């Protein structure tokens, strides 16, 4: 019997944090974290009455090492538990001379009958300084500050005071508009002007051209200097078309000199070559091996392994995929003709041994899609701000001018001036979007159109209804039935009846009278 493996318990700290709130902590965990074990209680209560600090008890051997103990040098004593003394710098005493003694006048005691008003008398002040000091007052003009209007207080007898406060005047505001332009070498802006007479401002480039016309005053002798064309910084080079690419997303990979492991797919001696025309081979190759349901979430970009029962034989949807037990993931390559090829390596399980091993050949399934050719270069336009392609709309220019030839020209086919034909409406009615509705006898809707008698040309009032209604003349040829008068009862006689009987008309039958019984 195998012994169960012992599972180590979690740390004491983590157990205490999780079980403290629920109150399910084990006693050993609770005592160890809260320090309430027997050893903790002995140290806690024993240290309160016994102090072993001065005995030198420790975990060492007590021999003092090789050289033994050395007595510590004596030094100043240290008071334990006392308040530290703060040393402050001493103050340097300064000598102060005797101050001038001022004469003090004696004040008579104040009698109760004396007045409480103290008269002010002029007294000569005592000079404190030995000599007179000349004082020069310098007047500096003070800038005028904001004037503050004093409020007007209106007070009437028997009413409260009214304080009228005037609003502060608003100083005029000066607005200054400035334009700052910073040169950014990473951003190039194209500024062009419309070829018209005018002025262009706020332009980043100024083009000065001469020889645009005008009148020259003076001699016509000018010096011709041979100039060299400076290429524009906005010019670009058109690259030559690149050769056809070998893959849709080419990657730069280092070529390995070693021999590739495995069998090459194009080896016809070892691998059977089968070309597949079914488009399901690209994304759903499992449907070519066996019948299955479609799962839109699953992408078959992996190696598929198919397991078949030994006692059953299933015909695959495609005969080329018979006995396929393994189909690899897709591999993309190019053919010498320039086509993109999708390849999958399959393994057949044709022969099965008694041990269960399957033996079969390898098959290379491939499908050629298309070729990847270089596209024609597209002429690109410069990105920037320019006004050369702007559309100028002028209302006066868009007006229509009619040139009427007043003079008579016998050879011209124009309309005569001031002719009434100019007032005719040449609009052409277009019924391309109309619908012709012709009703039958059963579902016919009739509308009454009133007619107004007037001396002018006849006009009609047509009711506005939904859809299009076409009025057309309708003639019906109905046969007129002439009924015989007077109505004579008809006696029906069967000529083919040999019995000689007859049938009376129901109107000739005698009516039954209802009689009352007494």
UniProtKB/Swiss-Prot annotation:
Modification(s) after translation: Highly phosphorylated.
Entries under Pfam families matching the protein: Late_protein_L2
Residue pairs linked by disulfide bridges in the UniProt entry: 19-25
Cellular component GO terms, alphabetical: host cell; host cell endosome; host cell Golgi apparatus; host cell nucleus; viral capsid
Sample GO molecular function, one term: DNA binding
Sorted UniProt keywords: Capsid protein, Cytoplasmic inwards viral transport, Disulfide bond, DNA-binding, Host endosome, Host Golgi apparatus, Host nucleus, Host-virus interaction, Late protein, Microtubular inwards viral transport, Phosphoprotein, Viral penetration into host nucleus, Virion, Virus entry into host cell
Residue interval(s) of motif Nuclear localization signal: 1-10, 510-517
Region entry Disordered, spans: 238-262
GO biological process: microtubule-dependent intracellular transport of viral material towards nucleus; symbiont entry into host cell; viral penetration into host nucleus
Cellular compartments annotated: Virion; Host nucleus; Host early endosome; Host Golgi apparatus
Major localisation: virion
Stated role: Minor protein of the capsid that localizes along the inner surface of the virion, within the central cavities beneath the L1 pentamers. Plays a role in capsid stabilization through interaction with the major capsid protein L1. Once the virion enters the host cell, L2 escorts the genomic DNA into the nucleus by promoting escape from the endosomal compartments and traffic through the host Golgi network.
Family that this chain belongs to: Belongs to the papillomaviridae L2 protein family.
Subunit field text: Interacts with major capsid protein L1. Interacts with E2; this interaction inhibits E2 transcriptional activity but not the DNA replication function E2. Interacts with host GADD45GIP1. Interacts with host HSPA8; this interaction is required for L2 nuclear translocation. Interacts with host importins KPNB2 and KPNB3. Forms a complex with importin alpha2-beta1 heterodimers via interaction with the importin alpha2 adapter. Interacts with host DYNLT1; this interaction is essential for virus intracellular transport during entry.
The protein, known as: Minor capsid protein L2
